[in-house]
């Protein structure tokens, strides 16, 4: 259906320009499904945002052991496939303005692409003027204390070892309180930082394995040291865990995994308020995407 904005542009003899929105899905989601695609659809349907979706093609997998696909890549391999596909698409469309939306594993892939855009010498730095902004949900690479205007939760940092710095103002990081993938302690207390570092160390080891489980389960197993899975993860640690902070690390991971449903803060962004006005994470993301799509182009 033709939007009012398109009709108005036609009446004025102007070209109606739509921004591409690259969507980076979560683990085991098919490209073009899940939170990122919901956000794009919401901005189009509710706000008539001048955008169209470009689903990033990747397996969005977490390994082959226990998976119906014997060739399913590990999490780390899956993320890199997504990164390379997105970079290739952007390079192939040098005159196309674009936004990005990513969730969970997809948020990590999106963040790596963002680094290529905002970092001098990055593969996409020369096209940074085409980037209008973006949204992450439950981002493992979230910059410490970064979120978005008016958001309730910004403490801590993403669980990954490599994270964003100097995140552009047009990019918001949405997290639910207690979502361990997007929020581990970062200080200022030394014990908090050490606990966060323990969790990150186990996570970085877990994502290298070809295991069809969620990362939180692998992290908890490694922290508690129970079972064969713990041995596999611990063997990949770059350095020993901090014993003093181990109890706090286990508590954080256990609270995340033991919720009903397990990892609830990470999978309920359509229900939990993230803003003082009661908007959920998905509603806030829709509004932000609509706003950056409608903003005048930078000079």
What name fits each language-model region?
Residues 2-14, 23-73, 77-92, 115-299:
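Surface cap/lid and interfacial helix-loop subdomains adjacent to catalytic sites
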Residues 90, 97-101:
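Structured, beta-strand-rich domain cores
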């Amino acid at each position: 259906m033709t939007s009012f904005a398109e009709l108005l542009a036609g009446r004025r003899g102007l070209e109606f320009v739509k921004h591409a929105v690259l969507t980076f899905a979560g683990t085991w989601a098919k490209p073009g499904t899940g939170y990122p695609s919901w956000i794009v659809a919401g901005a189009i349907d509710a706000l008539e945002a001048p955008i169209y979706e470009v689903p990033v093609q990747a397996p969005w997998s977490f390994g082959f052991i226990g998976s119906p696909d014997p060739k399913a890549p590990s999490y780390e391999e899956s993320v890199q496939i997504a990164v390379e596909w997105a970079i290739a698409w952007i390079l192939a469309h040098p005159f196309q303005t674009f936004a990005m939306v990513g969730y969970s594993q997809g948020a990590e892939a999106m963040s790596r692409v963002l680094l290529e855009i905002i970092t001098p010498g990055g593969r996409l730095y020369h096209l940074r003027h085409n980037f209008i902004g973006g949204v992450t949900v439950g981002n493992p690479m979230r910059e410490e204390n970064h979120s978005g205007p008016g958001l309730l939760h910004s403490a801590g940092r993403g669980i990954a070892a490599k994270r964003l710095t100097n995140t552009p103002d047009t990019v918001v990081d949405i997290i639910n309180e207690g979502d361990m993938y997007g929020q581990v302690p970062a200080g200022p207390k030394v014990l908090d930082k050490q606990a966060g570092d323990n969790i990150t160390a186990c996570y970085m080891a877990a994502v290298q394995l070809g295991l069809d489980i969620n990362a939180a389960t692998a992290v908890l197993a490694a922290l508690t040291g129970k079972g064969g899975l713990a041995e596999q993860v611990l063997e990949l640690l770059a350095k020993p865990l901090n014993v003093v902070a181990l109890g706090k690390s286990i508590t954080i991971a256990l609270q995340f995994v033991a919720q009903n449903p397990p990892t609830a803060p990470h999978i309920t962004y359509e229900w939990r308020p993230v803003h003082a006005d009661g908007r959920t994470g998905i509603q806030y993301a829709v509004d932000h995407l609509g706003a950056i799509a409608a903003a005048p182009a930078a000079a």
